[in-house]
C-alpha cells in the first residue's frame, strides 16, 4: 500500500481524538488541496480564532482490547503503519505549504508499548533536530509507556496527553481490561503535568502547553461527579491543563456495539462544568448534581447554580467585582473583564451597552440590576423539548471505523 493511502487511513483513525478548546464541527479549510487527505483538522484556539493541525496515528495495529475502539485487536480494519521518517517528511511537506501549523501524533499499541512510543519519539526528534521545526507538537502517550519516555516526550513536545478513559480502576476495567488506571495512566499523566509545569518556568525553554486527558463517557457506568472529581483534583494541582469528554457512540464490530449511546447533552454538560471549575472560580460542591451523581441534562450547570441562589442575586452590574460577575449566566471571563474595565471610564446606561460588552442579555437580565433597577422581572422561560435531551432519532451503532468518540 502506498504512503498516501496509509496516511489517509491513519489520519482518519486519529480524528476522533480531541484537541484545542473544542473540536470544530466543520471541514478543514484546506478544501480539495492534494494534501488535504493526510489529516488536516481545524481546532479552536483559547483566545479565539483557529489553527490547522495534521493529526495522524503512526500505526493502527493494536494488541489492546478496548471495548469502544474499532482498531482493538479483534477489529476488522486494515492494519497499516508509517515510519518516523515518513511521518516527519509528510508533516514538513504539509507545513511548508501552509496547510498545518502543528502536529498531533498518536499510535496503536502493537505488542510492547515502549517500542511504539520509541517510534513516536523518533518522529518528534526528527522534526526538532533534522527538520528544525520549532512549532506546536502534541503527543498522545500510550498506556504502558515508561517514565523515561515521558521525560523525553516532555523535552520534545509542547503538549502531552494521556487518556484516563474513566475515573477509576473499576470503570477502566469495564472499558479496557488491558489498561491500569491507578498503576499506569494516572501516574503517567501526573508525571507529564509536573514536567511540563517545570519547563514553563525555565527561561528560553520550548513553550509548554500543559497536559490533557480524555474520558469516554457513559459505557462504564461512571457518574459525572466522579469524572469531575478527578479532573478538579488534577487541575487544582496544576497537573492538568484541561480535560476532554467524549459521549460514547457504539461502533459495529466492537465489544460494546450493543451498548446504548450516551446523550450528546451529557458531554456538553461536562464541558460546561469543567469550564466553571477551571475558569469561573466554582468549586465542585457548588455544582448541582442529581441523586444519581450526574449533571442536569435540561439546564446548564451555571444556570442551575444561579436558580438555586436567590439570596446572591440580583447583582449591581456597575459595582460588583469581576469574580461575582462570573457567576451571572450569560457573562463569561472576557465579558466580565470588559465590564470591569469599561465602567472605569464610561457609564453603562442600558441593555445595549451590556450587549455591546458581550453580555447575553436574555440570559443575564434577571440576575442583574443597572443603577438599582432590575433588568428583568423573571428568569427566561425554558423551552420544552420534543425529545429527551441529547437523544437522537436513531441509536443504531455506527458502521464506520471512525466513531465520534475517543478511542486512543
Tell what function each PLM region has.
Residues 145-156, 220-236:
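Catalytic cores of alpha/beta
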Residues 72-87, 94-120, 126-149, 154-203, ...:
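Core AdoMet radical
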Residues 255-326, 363-408:
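Long, highly charged, low-complexity intrinsically disordered interaction regions
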Residues 1-64, 360-361, 368, 373-408:
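Flexible, acidic/Gly-rich N-terminal and inter-domain linker regions that tether
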Residues 114, 167-177, 202-222, 241-264, ...:
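Flexible glycine/acidic-rich beta-alpha junction loops that bind and position SAM and/or redox cofactors
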Residues 53, 66, 105, 162, ...:
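Conserved, mostly hydrophobic/aromatic
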Residues 342-343:
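Residue-level signature of tetratricopeptide-repeat
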Amino acid at each position: 500500500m502506498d504512503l498516501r493511502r496509509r496516511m489517509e487511513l491513519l489520519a482518519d483513525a486519529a480524528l476522533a481524538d480531541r484537541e484545542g478548546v473544542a473540536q470544530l464541527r466543520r471541514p478543514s479549510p484546506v478544501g480539495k488541496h492534494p494534501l488535504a487527505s493526510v489529516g488536516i483538522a481545524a481546532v479552536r484556539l483559547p483566545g479565539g480564532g483557529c489553527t490547522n493541525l495534521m493529526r495522524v496515528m503512526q500505526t493502527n495495529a493494536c494488541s489492546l482490547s478496548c471495548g469502544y475502539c474499532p482498531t482493538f485487536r479483534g477489529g476488522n480494519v486494515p492494519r497499516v503503519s508509517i515510519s518516523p521518517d515518513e511521518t516527519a517528511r509528510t508533516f514538513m511537506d504539509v507545513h511548508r505549504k501552509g496547510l498545518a501549523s502543528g502536529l498531533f501524533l498518536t499510535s496503536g499499541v502493537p505488542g510492547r508499548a515502549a517500542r511504539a512510543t520509541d517510534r513516536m519519539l523518533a518522529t518528534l526528534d526528527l522534526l526538532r533536530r533534522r527538520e528544525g521545526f520549532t512549532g506546536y507538537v502534541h503527543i498522545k502517550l500510550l498506556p504502558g509507556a515508561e517514565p523515561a519516555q515521558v521525560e523525553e516526550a516532555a523535552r520534545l513536545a509542547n503538549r502531552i496527553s494521556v487518556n484516563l478513559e474513566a475515573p477509576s480502576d473499576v470503570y477502566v476495567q469495564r472499558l479496557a481490561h488491558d489498561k491500569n488506571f491507578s498503576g499506569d495512566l494516572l501516574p503517567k499523566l501526573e508525571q507529564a503535568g509536573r514536567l511540563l509545569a517545570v519547563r514553563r518556568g525555565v527561561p528560553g525553554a520550548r513553550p509548554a502547553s500543559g497536559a490533557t486527558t480524555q474520558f469516554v463517557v457513559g459505557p462504564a457506568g461512571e457518574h459525572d461527579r466522579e469524572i469531575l472529581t478527578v479532573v478538579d483534583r488534577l487541575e487544582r494541582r496544576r497537573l492538568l491543563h484541561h480535560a476532554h469528554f467524549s459521549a460514547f457512540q457504539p461502533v459495529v464490530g466492537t465489544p460494546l456495539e450493543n451498548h446504548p449511546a450516551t446523550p450528546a447533552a451529557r458531554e456538553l454538560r461536562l464541558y460546561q462544568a469543567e469550564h466553571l471549575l477551571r475558569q469561573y472560580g466554582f468549586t465542585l460542591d457548588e455544582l448541582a448534581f442529581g441523586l444519581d451523581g450526574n449533571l442536569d441534562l435540561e439546564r446548564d450547570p451555571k444556570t442551575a447554580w444561579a436558580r438555586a441562589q436567590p439570596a446572591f442575586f440580583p447583582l449591581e452590574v456597575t459595582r460588583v467585582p469581576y469574580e461575582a460577575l462570573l457567576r451571572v449566566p450569560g457573562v463569561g471571563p472576557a465579558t466580565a473583564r470588559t465590564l470591569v474595565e469599561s465602567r472605569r471610564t464610561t457609564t453603562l446606561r442600558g441593555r445595549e451597552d451590556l450587549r455591546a460588552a458581550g453580555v447575553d442579555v436574555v440570559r443575564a437580565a434577571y440576575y442583574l440590576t443597572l443603577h438599582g433597577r432590575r433588568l428583568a422581572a423573571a428568569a427566561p422561560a425554558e423551552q420544552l423539548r420534543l425529545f429527551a435531551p441529547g437523544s437522537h432519532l436513531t441509536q443504531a451503532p455506527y458502521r464506520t471505523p471512525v466513531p465520534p468518540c475517543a478511542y486512543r
